[in-house]
């Protein structure tokens, strides 16, 4: 989450007039994240999140995202629910951006990931996959393998500003990953961004999952690879196999991985690390000055990528 578009008090008041949730009492931007403009909104009717959609989000995809959240919540996944206006619509325009209000989930995300967090994260990811199985609409993963070559092409000429030789290293990794990428794994709807700041805990229990705006239809095990990258590396870039094992056990307790998924885990993790290295590289080089957004170091994911390229099999992840 982040803030790129500033919302005036007058614009907010006019926007809220379309809803039955009261008038604004407090309103503040959220600096964490990199994609959309997000605000915590307190009204006389309760607490909410206001999101203005920016950058990579295609407005045509927004009904799919909001529909998925409603679908998952109806099947027991605790996630934000879109708030519909008096006209029954969840989407409308604000300050030149498509915008929506969702409910506020209690809890905090873990600033320091512990092993105890990882098992419930694996569980909720598997539950999410199962709950989404009967959501009929599909959405192409725009940041899947087909999206990586154009991203690298945009950034390669400046990649060495981050680290000498980085452009060539990423190109070699991309060529290797695309050659080995599996095409026949079990597929469904994936979260695709299950980072610690998108998972809330309350009283040491997982209390909710947020930020479905990268969700797509893709290989389910790719979502696991994203989660392993996000939850199971230490600050010194070392993979924590104890955390990885806990996450994988949690997932397998709900949905058992196939042998093909297990065999593909190293290349899926390579692809996941490459995807986030590339998007972070793009954002690092292109974030507008003064934006209320936290830039994230692409090298964190380059280090992860190097680990995955050396991983011989799924056993390296604790499976």
Curated annotation (Swiss-Prot):
SUPFAM superfamilies membership: Protein kinase-like (PK-like)
EC numbers: 2.7.1.39
Pfam family, one: APH
Catalysed reactions, semicolon-separated: L-homoserine + ATP = O-phospho-L-homoserine + ADP + H(+)
Gene3D superfamilies: 3.90.1200.10, Phosphorylase Kinase, domain 1
One MF annotation (Gene Ontology) recorded for this entry: homoserine kinase activity
Record InterPro entries: Aminoglycoside_PTrfase, Homoserine_kinase_II, Kinase-like_dom_sf, Pseudomonas-type_ThrB
Domain of life, per lineage: Bacteria
GO biological process: threonine biosynthetic process
Pathway terms, separated by semicolons: Amino-acid biosynthesis; L-threonine biosynthesis; L-threonine from L-aspartate: step 4/5
Record's keyword terms, sorted: Amino-acid biosynthesis, ATP-binding, Kinase, Nucleotide-binding, Threonine biosynthesis, Transferase
Family: Belongs to the pseudomonas-type ThrB family.
Protein name: Homoserine kinase
Species this protein is from: Granulibacter bethesdensis (strain ATCC BAA-1260 / CGDNIH1)
């Amino acid at each position: 989450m982040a803030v790129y578009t500033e919302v005036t008090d007058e614009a907010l008041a006019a926007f809220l007039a379309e809803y039955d949730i009261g008038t604004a009492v407090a309103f503040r931007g959220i600096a964490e994240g990199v994609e959309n403009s997000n605000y915590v909104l307190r009204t006389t009717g309760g607490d909410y999140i206001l999101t203005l959609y920016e950058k990579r989000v295609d407005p045509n995809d927004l009904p799919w995202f909001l529909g998925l959240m409603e679908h998952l919540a109806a099947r027991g996944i605790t996630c934000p629910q879109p708030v519909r206006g008096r006209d029954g619509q969840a989407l409308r325009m604000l300050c030149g951006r498509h915008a929506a209000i969702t409910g506020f989930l209690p809890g905090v995300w873990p600033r320091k990931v512990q092993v105890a967090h990882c098992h419930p994260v694996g569980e909720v990811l598997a539950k999410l996959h199962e709950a989404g199985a009967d959501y009929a609409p599909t959405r192409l993963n725009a940041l899947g393998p087909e999206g990586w070559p154009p991203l690298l092409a945009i950034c390669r000429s400046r990649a060495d500003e981050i680290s000498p030789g980085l452009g060539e290293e990423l190109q070699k990794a991309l060529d290797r990953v695309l050659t080995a990428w599996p095409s026949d794994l079990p597929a469904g709807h994936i979260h695709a961004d299950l980072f610690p700041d998108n998972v809330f805990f309350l009283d040491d229990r997982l209390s909710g999952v947020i930020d479905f705006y990268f969700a797509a239809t893709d290989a389910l095990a790719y979502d696991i690879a994203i989660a392993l990258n996000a939850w199971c590396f230490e600050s010194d870039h070392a993979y924590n196999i104890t955390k990885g094992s806990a996450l994988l056990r949690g997932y397998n307790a709900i949905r058992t991985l196939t042998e093909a998924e297990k065999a593909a885990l190293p290349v899926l993790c390579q692809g996941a690390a490459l995807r986030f290295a590339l998007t972070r590289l793009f954002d690092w080089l292109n974030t507008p000055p003064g934006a209320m957004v936290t830039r994230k170091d692409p090298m964190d994911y380059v280090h992860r990528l190097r680990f995955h390229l050396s991983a011989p099999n799924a056993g390296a992840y604790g499976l």
